[in-house]
Amino acid sequence: MSRIMLAGPSGIGKTTFANIIARDYELEFQSGSMRTLMPDMKEVSHADMLKEDKKVQYQKDFQLLNLRNKKFGNLDSFVTDRSYLDSAAYFIYKQSSFQPQCEVDNFLDLCKMLLCRQCDKLIMFDFPTYMIKDWVMADENDKRIHNKYFQHLIAGIMNQVLSIWGSKLRFEFLHHSEKFWEAPDV
């Protein structure tokens, strides 16, 4: 049984790497993307999603969490290009200045619970400061936010969430380095 989830900022290579893991370890690739799970969002850019009414975003965040739970909850072996860490980080980014802390805590607790139940290995693609100037973002469908400072911010929030959740989680950091394409232990 291998249930592998990837986390990291948009355009860093999660889907590409998840497909490589799926191929090399004969695991089924499962897309966890909002665009896949919520087809009405397929043509909406990330920037436009972030401009939506905060109440609408709040409802969609819970809807996406539920859809990921339904998709991954009964699978014994898979690799996916998204994780509950992604959900937690984007929720903090979008909602922390609008929702009471107890609402944010509740959402993060749900994400942590689902991650612990449905993930054996979390691979995080970090976005350290040195990458801001030189990183070339993949964006085949022109839907991503291209501002590298935004992507760096999201990666930072993910690191903070992991710190909040504590060391009991089993995860790996996969930093952008020479080891980028080395296969993880699965």
Q: Where are the regions that the model predicts?
A:
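Hydrophobic anchor at the beta1->P-loop junction of P-loop NTPases
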Residues: L6
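Conserved substrate/cofactor phosphate-moiety recognition/catalytic segment
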Residues: N19, R23-L67
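P-loop (Walker A) phosphate-binding loop of NTP-binding proteins
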Residues: P9
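Pre-Walker A (Motif I) flank of P-loop NTPase domains
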Residues: M1-R3
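Charged phosphate-binding loop/patch that engages nucleotide di/tri-phosphates or the phosphate backbone
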Residues: Q160-V186
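Conserved lysine of the Walker
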Residues: K14
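A glycine- and Lys/Arg-enriched "phosphate-lid" helix/loop adjacent to the NTP-binding pocket
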Residues: K94-L162, E172
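Glycine-rich phosphate-binding loop used to anchor ATP phosphates in small-molecule kinases
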Residues: Q57-C116
